[in-house]
Amino acid sequence: MLIDQGQYELTILIWLIIAISTFILLMFIRAPYGRHERPGWGPRLPSRIGWIIMESPCILIMTVFFGFGVTKWSVIDFTAITFYTMWIAHYIHRSWVWPARARITGKRMPFSIVFFAVAFNSINSWINAEWLYSLHHPYPSSWLYSPQFVIGFVLFLIGMGINIKSDNILFSLRHDGKTDYKIPNKGLFKWVSCPNYFGEIIEWCGWALATWSLAGLSFAIWGMANLIPRARSNHKWYLKNFSDYPVERKILIPKIW
């Protein structure tokens, strides 16, 4: 335990205030990476390396806390193993699989974006790991059968499936090795511009339910604070750059927005 319960809850409160402020800021300023990358944001590095650097702390920090937790076990803690597996499954894909598959050779991102992403991922991973394997450890073994865990776990899997499936559709648009952007028309892309973000939001809402914690809730809120403005920017970008883009297609939530 690095801090007591009161200090931890105060940290999350401050973290949530920053999330809301970030949401407001990103509604007016497009984060300069990917299709929105532009000069004026300082030194840049290869995008593939940047992605690996900025996402890998999530694996490292959670693994360190999980490892220390294992040393205290008197019996196998299946709940702790399940939460660790959920987290690591997402971040192995996000940190290593996605950058390896993405057609981003030759593309670059600002070092400042990598720096802020490392800071966010480190703090967010610590908040969740501290709760799971220190402050609240252990969850009872019966937790895996509780309604909140079962519903949350199912949502997590559904969201992860949508996220990966949508990424695969985007990858398939560049199977010829070209890096030009194209209009995706398969899967949930028929209804929204950013189903990959929609899936990730569902995923972390599921995590919040499954852990039934302020840590999980703060991550879900942060996910929305980052991905909702990003989805809006991507949708506007499609409309601006493709004259034949389906005008009836929503931004993030099918049939709604």
Regions found by a protein language model. Give the residues of each.
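Membrane-helix and juxtamembrane interface regions of eukaryotic multi-pass membrane proteins
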Residues: 1-116, 257
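Hydrophobic transmembrane alpha-helices
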Residues: 2-25, 64-65, 69, 75-76, ...
